[in-house]
C-alpha cells in the first residue's frame, strides 16, 4: 500500500474509531462470545440425566431425578459431550466462508452478521423444544462465532500501534479464557436460581447491544487486500 493509499484509508475511517476503541470493542465481543462456551459447560446448566450418575449406588440411581438440560431432554453424558463440541462444525464451515466473503463484503459488517447469528443461536437454545433443535442452534452459534474468529485478528494487525501488534493480540485472546470462566460462574448462578434456559437467554441479551453497535455504526474497512492467510492465523 502506497503512502497516498494509506492517507486515503485513514480519511475513510469513521468518527467513532480509534485503535484503542476497536481493541476494547473486540475484547468485549470476545468475552461475550466465550461466555456462551462457559454457560454450556456449567454444571448447573448441564444438570444430571434421569437415573443419576455412575458415582451413585444402585438404589440412589434408581430414585434419582434428572435436572437441568440433561434432565429436561433425557440426555446422557455422552450426548451432552456432543452438544458441547458440535459448535466446531459451524466454526470450521463458517471461518473460510467469512474469510472469502471479506473480499467483497465489508469485514466489520460480516462481524456484525456473525454476532447476530450468535444472539439468535443463544435465543434458540433458550427456547429449544428438543435436543436436536438445540444441536442445530449450537452449530449456528459456531457459524456466527467464525466471523469474529476469522476477521478480528486482521483488524488488530491493521490498527495496532507499531511494535504493539503481538501485545494487542494477546489482550484479545486473553479474553477467551476469561469469557469461559465468567460463563461458568454466570451459568452456575443463573442456572441454579432461574434455570438453564434463562442462562442462554441472558447471554443472547448480552450480545444484542454489541450486535446493534456493529450493525448500525459506520463500518471500518480492512487495510489488507488479501485476508485469507490472516484469517487462518486468526482462527487458531
Language model regions located:
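Cytosolic juxtamembrane N-terminal segment immediately preceding the first transmembrane helix
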Residues: 1-43, 55-56, 71
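Residue-level signature of mid-helix packing/kink "hotspots" within the transmembrane helices
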Residues: 38, 88-96, 146, 180-181
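Extracellular/periplasmic helix-loop-helix junction of adjacent transmembrane segments
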Residues: 44-92
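Helix-breaking motifs and short loop linkers at transmembrane-helix boundaries and internal kinks
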Residues: 74, 106, 127-132, 144, ...
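Conserved MFS/SLC helix-loop-helix module at the cytosolic interface between two early adjacent transmembrane helices
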Residues: 93-129
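Paired small-residue
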Residues: 121, 132-140
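Cytoplasmic helix-loop-helix junction between adjacent transmembrane helices
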Residues: 137-176
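Helix-loop-helix hairpin linking two adjacent transmembrane segments in secondary transporters
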Residues: 172-222
